[in-house]
């Protein structure tokens, strides 16, 4: 296709050299100016890093012209899900400034100067702010939007699917048409970008396949410079061309798929044309589009970590100079008579001056507050009349801090802490002592630093889950006993009827109503835009949910079994869990991930790897109900909040009978609040999920031996026991056992740390704490395999009895 651009199923063939653009001379020269500003910014940014003003630099040089062409068709309401090469696009679309470019390099923590992430991410990781300061939605339909970037290659792809699917739902579900601050009836395109090497990742192919199936307005651009750091395309991609191997996805007479466009990264005319043509199809027909932009370059190499001269041949480097996109645009402008060399020279000079000015402004914004902070502290620390032996050491630390030309927070705080250690009680007068003043200053600065660097792991808005109080289920004498799955089904029915933003999806969720019938009949009642099936693609099921939630919907994404969550754990950990944190409260994705887990049958349908999950998804609530009533209450709670959650239904409890609450759909189970299931006085047993019923059996067995056990269902692993109820039980019993079916040292160790260290429960122990867990291996098949792999009531009994024997051997003699 070197001479033509093919648009499948449209019969359009256009010679590249026919320039039909409506862009006038001023627009072309403005594009040239912007390309040069972006290139100079890359060069100057690299210099700032290499001279020590920044820690790391990664840039988008070599990709300027294609990104300018793409920005021309990016509208208010549209969304970007891209990566760290997109600085020119962000500048051209007006979502980013040169001052912000340098503020990112310096790590400026002032949201005014670095609004995308407040200094939490390395440079060229972009985002716009979807939320007001109070955490409420802005009018995102009237602004251009960029979802928050992450570094993992292809990590932007799963969320892109959801951003595009949202447009389809906003268009086809008329109940959503009134939500004009979220969407203009689905007239938005989700733009994705990815490097050619990253298309080798599974996330890319999974997303592309799903987009082709869903037929959604997703436009993905592949920036192809021929390399993945030092690895060339021939070792990355079959046929060395992503468009060639994606040809089977192309829309044609045999069925739906993608429109596929190709162009060269240096061909301004062609790039403007294909983006205008391709995005029009994408927006108007809601069909996905792939733009493969090849013959791009990377003039300064991958990043500031090294030079591409180490792995590119002299011939390749010379080719990159000849085919540099800005040089080619300059040649084209001169050749066509749009402007002469002198005029372009002036544009280039003005661009360089503009970038230098932006750098100076950004640096002053960053360094002045730090210099002031340093000087204020030194002034405070100079107030002393003491002549003790440590004064010289204090003076030395102050001198070293004073001569640092460009101090950072670490320099100042580290010096202050070292000085505090050396201050004696006689320094200054007691009422205004140096120790008191420095301590107060440090406390204030540490609090401020926590706000700057550690806020917004969870929601700070008025809709935070922790603020939602519980409402108990209400029962009457006539409340029927039904299988637990019916409680969930009726609860979902009430949710779908009440909230038009809620959409539920997953494998087998739609037509058959879920593998355990918890959504039975709901697709027929509410339609395929509210509850629907997906393919077997866990990573993009979660990513789909992330993107939908970022656009203001309330998605519920089902992962059929907890064991298969691992396919999507990277998306949860790197994208969903970090979103509010990495944007410092600028974006949110209140996604509910529902799954079923714990013991049932065989290695891959009996998993309970909670420690792996809770330690990788901080930022997501992890809720572990013991039955379907508690699960329903958690769904109701989280749908009132603006935070993401993973809710794990007990896999072996769908057929167990539970009373149907009279207030179905309205009762709420609060997060972070355990429930005491059995009161006792001798020992505390702490567990959750499917283990609760096993523990209840063990409690009955223990009673026969005069042991009174207090059984506590934690219900919520993250957050965990926020009111320290377990500690109060331990104060009474002075003995504790933590029980679950995770691996040894897993979630039981997590719970133990929370109670003994964080809650200071250690001081109330009469004997060592115990854990009862599964074996280190996966659960074997069959009843006996489960019995000898997972902990059972007898294991709990034995652990408790042995502990009681250790405390009082005469009352509890050995029986084992």
PLM region spans:
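Conserved acidic/glycine
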Residues: 1-66, 72-73, 299-301, 305-526, ...
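Thiamine diphosphate
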Residues: 64-68, 145-406, 412, 503, 651-816, ...
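Short beta-strand segments
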Residues: 83-84, 154, 193-194, 221-224, ...
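Active-site phosphate/pyrophosphate-binding segments
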Residues: 587, 597-601, 605, 610, ...
């Amino acid at each position: 296709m070197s001479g033509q651009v093919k648009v499948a199923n449209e019969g359009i063939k256009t010679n590249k050299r026919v320039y039909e653009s409506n862009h006038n001379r001023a627009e072309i020269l403005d594009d040239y100016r912007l390309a040069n500003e972006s290139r100079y910014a890359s060069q100057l940014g690299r210099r700032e890093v290499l001279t020590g003003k920044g820690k790391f630099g990664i840039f988008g040089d070599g990709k300027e012209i294609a990104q300018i062409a793409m920005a021309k068709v990016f509208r208010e309401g549209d969304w970007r899900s891209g990566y760290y090469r997109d600085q020119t696009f962000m500048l051209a679309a007006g979502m980013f400034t040169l001052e912000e470019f340098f503020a990112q390099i310096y790590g400026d923590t002032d949201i005014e100067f670095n609004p995308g992430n407040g200094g939490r991410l390395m440079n060229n990781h972009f985002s716009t702010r979807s939320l007001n300061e109070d955490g409420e939605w802005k009018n995102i339909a009237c602004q251009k939007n960029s979802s928050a970037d992450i570094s993992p290659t292809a990590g932007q792809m799963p969320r892109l699917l959801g951003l595009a699917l949202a447009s389809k739902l906003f268009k086809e579900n008329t109940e959503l048409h009134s939500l004009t601050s979220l969407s203009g009836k689905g007239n938005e395109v989700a733009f994705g970008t990815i490097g050619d090497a990253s298309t080798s990742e599974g996330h890319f192919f999974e997303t592309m396949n799903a987009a082709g199936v869903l037929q959604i307005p997703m436009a993905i651009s592949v920036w192809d410079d021929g390399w993945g750091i030092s690895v060339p395309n021939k070792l990355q991609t079959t046929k060395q061309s992503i468009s060639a191997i994606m040809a089977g996805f192309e829309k044609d007479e045999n069925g739906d798929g993608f429109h596929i466009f190709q162009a060269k990264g240096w061909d301004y005319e062609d790039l403007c044309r294909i983006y205008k043509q391709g995005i029009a199809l994408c927006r108007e027909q809601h069909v996905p589009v792939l733009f493969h932009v090849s013959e791009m370059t990377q003039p300064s190499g991958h990043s500031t970590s090294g030079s591409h001269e180490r792995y590119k041949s002299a011939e390749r480097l010379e080719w990159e100079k000849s085919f540099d996109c800005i040089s080619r645009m300059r040649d084209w402008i001169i050749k066509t008579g749009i402007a002469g060399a002198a005029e372009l020279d002036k544009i280039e000079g003005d661009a360089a001056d503009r970038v230098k000015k932006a750098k100076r402004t950004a640096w002053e914004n960053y360094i002045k507050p730090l210099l002031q902070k340093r000087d204020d502290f030194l002034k405070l620390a100079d107030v002393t009349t003491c002549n003790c032996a440590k004064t010289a050491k204090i003076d030395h630390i102050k001198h070293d801090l004073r001569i640092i030309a460009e101090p950072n927070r670490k320099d100042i705080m580290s010096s202050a802490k070292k000085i505090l250690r050396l201050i004696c009680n006689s320094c200054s007068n007691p009422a205004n002592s140096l120790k008191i003043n420095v301590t107060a200053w440090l406390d204030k600065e540490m609090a401020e630093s926590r706000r700057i660097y550690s806020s917004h792991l969870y929601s700070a808005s008025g809709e935070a889950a922790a603020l939602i109080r519980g409402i108990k289920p209400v029962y009457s004498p006539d409340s029927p006993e039904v299988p637990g799955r019916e409680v969930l089904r009726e609860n979902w029915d009430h949710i779908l009827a009440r909230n038009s933003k809620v959409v539920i999806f997953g494998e087998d969720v739609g037509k058959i109503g879920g593998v355990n019938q918890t959504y039975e009949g709901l697709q027929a009642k509410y339609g395929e835009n509210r509850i629907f099936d997906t393919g077997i693609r866990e990573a993009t099921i979660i990513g789909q949910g992330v993107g939908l939630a970022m656009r203001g919907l309330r998605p519920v994404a089902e992962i059929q079994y907890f064991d298969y969550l691992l396919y999507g754990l990277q998306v949860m950990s790197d994208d969903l869990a970090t979103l509010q944190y990495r944007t410092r409260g600028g974006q949110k994705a209140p996604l509910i991930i529902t799954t079923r887990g714990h013991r049932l049958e065989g290695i891959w349908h009996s998993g309970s790897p909670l420690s792996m999950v809770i330690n990788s998804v901080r930022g997501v609530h992890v809720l572990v109900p013991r039955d379907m009533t508690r699960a329903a209450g958690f769904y109701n709670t989280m749908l009132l909040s603006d935070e993401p959650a993973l809710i794990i239904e007990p896999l072996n409890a769908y057929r167990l009978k539970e009373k149907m609450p009279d207030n179905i759909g309205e009762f709420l189970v609060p997060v972070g609040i355990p429930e005491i299931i059995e009161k006792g006085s001798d020992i505390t047993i702490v567990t959750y999920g499917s283990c609760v019923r096993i523990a209840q059996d063990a409690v009955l067995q223990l009673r026969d031996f005069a042991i009174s056990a207090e059984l506590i269902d934690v219900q919520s692993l993250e957050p965990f026991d926020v009111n320290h109820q377990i500690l109060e039980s331990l104060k009474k019993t002075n003995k504790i056992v933590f029980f679950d079916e995770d691996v040894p040292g897993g979630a039981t160790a997590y719970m133990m740390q929370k109670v003994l260290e964080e809650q200071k429960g250690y001081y109330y122990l009469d004997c060592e704490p115990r854990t009862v867990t599964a074996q280190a291996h996966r659960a074997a098949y069959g009843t006996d395999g489960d019995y000898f792999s997972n902990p059972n009531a007898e294991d709990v009994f034995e652990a408790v009895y042995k502990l009681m024997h250790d405390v009082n051997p005469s009352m509890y003699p050995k029986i084992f």
